[in-house]
């Protein structure tokens, strides 16, 4: 049986670099015009290091993907769509529970009640901690554990936990906040990090 290990973290900003040409053409969110301002942050990589025929602009079968020399991914991780606008946290937790147990222990609204999820602000990290404490699982969280504070340490953190078969539940606080599960990381086989890819199980992904 798989060891029940889980990581909970608040990630204020997760920047998935690479494929920015695609974003410029497809994203409804303005991300700036190259050359209009000095390049800073992710903007400095616009058009650089794009991977020709990248599999991530197709529809990869993440469920059946296998790790290789540059991809680390949790196999057979099933995604779940959240049933309300505010239960991304409970849905993310249930995805992880199902990954380990083959089924959920509580329905999404029951998990939301245990977490103290709110229709106005959703679920905070303490709520996540409350649920996994209730079901008796071993886990780490940003409430009590050290979390990476730079890109290089973050990559090590992600790779080491995925190789240890440990999903990472993360929340970004931009645009109202949203919980997802990191299930994979791909270096794309290059030394630079501007084309790296994080693979997330997103309970609000309707594609």
Where are these regions (language model features)?
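N-terminal Sec-pathway targeting helices
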Residues: 1-13
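Hydrophobic alpha-helical membrane-insertion segments, chiefly the h-region
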Residues: 13-24
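Conserved active-site-adjacent core of cysteine acyl-enzyme catalytic domains
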Residues: 23-62, 66-73, 109-207
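A short glycine/serine-rich beta->alpha loop
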Residues: 74-84, 116-117
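Active-site nucleophilic cysteine motif
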Residues: 82-98, 120-132
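Active-site catalytic microenvironments for nucleophilic, acid-base chemistry
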Residues: 95-100, 185-188
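Short, solvent-exposed loop/turn elements at domain surfaces
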Residues: 97-98, 105, 207
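Short, well-structured active-site flanking segments
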Residues: 101-111
